């Protein structure tokens, strides 16, 4: 019994302040996504397969903040766990807003150093859908952690 209770107790203490609420895409979030150009008919994933998370994270000053992100339902529990682990070690996140807040512009979201996931778009330099279009890729602090092309090029000067 002690073997079971001790890990549960330690996990509970470690994540006592961490919160992450998961929900389906509500009509309000759907409206934001459509008006913000991050989802439209023809995207490879229907809205019913996406989940909205409100996640507590730490900023670069160590303050607790609430952010939001959308991911595929198949990875939502893993994403919640990973962000819990990041919270526990004090890993800072500049901001976490939906790409819709940047009119679906990956460029603008990155320039704002915004941590984001779902965005229905083509992969950089490709005609194929990006992993972000499936809600299965996350950019965390993209200025500090930039996308680097195969040739070693970084597109954002602040990176």
Where in the sequence are the language-model features?
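Sec-dependent N-terminal signal peptides
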Residues: 4-13
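N-terminal module-boundary/linker segments of secreted carbohydrate-active enzymes
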Residues: 17-63
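Catalytic cores and adjacent binding grooves of peptidoglycan-active enzymes
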Residues: 123-125, 129, 134-159
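Active-site acidic/histidine clusters and adjacent loop/turn architecture
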Residues: 45-110
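Structural recognition of the beta-strand scaffold that forms the well-ordered cores
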Residues: 54-56, 117-120, 137-141
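Conserved short secondary-structure elements within globular domains
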Residues: 101-128
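Residues that flank catalytic or metal-binding motifs in active/ligand-binding sites
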Residues: 49-51, 114, 133-136
């Amino acid at each position: 019994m002690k073997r079971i209770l001790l890990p549960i107790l330690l996990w509970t203490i470690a994540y006592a302040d961490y919160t992450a609420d998961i929900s389906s895409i509500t009509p309000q979030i759907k409206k934001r996504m459509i008006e913000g150009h991050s989802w439209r008919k023809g995207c490879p994933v229907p809205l019913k397969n996406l989940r909205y998370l409100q996640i507590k994270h730490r900023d670069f000053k160590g303050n607790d903040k609430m952010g939001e992100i959308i991911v595929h339902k198949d990875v939502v529990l893993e994403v919640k766990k990973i962000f819990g682990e990041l919270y526990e070690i004090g890993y800072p996140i500049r901001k976490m807003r939906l790409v819709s807040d940047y009119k679906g512009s990956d460029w603008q979201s990155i320039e704002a150093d915004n941590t984001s996931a779902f965005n229905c778009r083509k992969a950089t330099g490709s005609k194929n859908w990006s992993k972000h279009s499936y809600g299965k890729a996350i950019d965390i602090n993209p200025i500090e952690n930039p996308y680097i092309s195969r040739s070693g090029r970084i597109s954002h000067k602040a990176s």
